[in-house]
Amino acid sequence: MSEQKIEVVGKLGSTYGIRGWLRLYSSTEKAESIFDYQPWFLKIKGQWQLIELESWRYHSNDLIVKLKGTEDREAAQLLTNAEIGVDLSVFPKLGEEDYYWHDLINCQVVNLENYTMGVVTELMETGSNDVLVVRANSKDAFGKQERLIPFLYKQVVKRVDLSTKTITVDWDAGF
């Protein structure tokens, strides 16, 4: 898989029934969108393996899936908790000021005074806007361990340079 870059989009949960079905936990914005990204790879024993989706449906409020070659409960149990990944090439291209969260993770964040705020470890969705969770450097001059910085392009986030993995923000280092 060296030529492919895999992004995790979900995870298999516990088995459902005796015919090889599994619960599915989707990381996509809309749970059903996970089915738009094919083919799937499962991380089994640390290795990504191509897997084919046979069928899916809702059971109550849960998504459940049937994978080809998984015919019974015992076979399905071997896949419990496996991460589901897709090749990054299947994601649609975005506009100039739009970014996938996975592109922003591990970016260095600096403010307009060129103070290094830390590194993006995750993003949160708040309803009104996304928020960068920035882990501060261990020797942060302001004693911060973590900063929450709203991802408001042009207002707070002034520049994103994915080639250097740098995000420039208009944000006080003391916050």
Curated annotation (Swiss-Prot):
Top-level division of the source organism's lineage: Bacteria
Gene3D superfamilies in UniProt: PRC-barrel domain, RimM
One of the GO biological process terms: rRNA processing
Annotated ranges, domain PRC barrel: 96-175
Sequence similarity: Belongs to the RimM family.
Keywords: Chaperone, Cytoplasm, Ribosome biogenesis, rRNA processing
Subcellular location field: Cytoplasm
NCBIfam families in UniProt: 16S_RimM (TIGR02273)
Record-given protein name: Ribosome maturation factor RimM
UniProt xrefs under InterPro entries: PRC_barrel-like_sf, PRC_RimM, RimM, RimM_N, RimM_N_sf, Transl_B-barrel_sf
GO MF, one example: ribosome binding
UniProt KW rRNA processing keyword: yes
GO terms for cellular component: cytoplasm; ribosome
Function summary: An accessory protein needed during the final step in the assembly of 30S ribosomal subunit, possibly for assembly of the head region. Essential for efficient processing of 16S rRNA. May be needed both before and after RbfA during the maturation of 16S rRNA. It has affinity for free ribosomal 30S subunits but not for 70S ribosomes.
Recorded domain comment: The PRC barrel domain binds ribosomal protein uS19.
Pfam families registered for this protein in UniProt: PRC_RimM, RimM
Record's subunit section: Binds ribosomal protein uS19.
Keyword Cytoplasm among UniProt keywords: yes
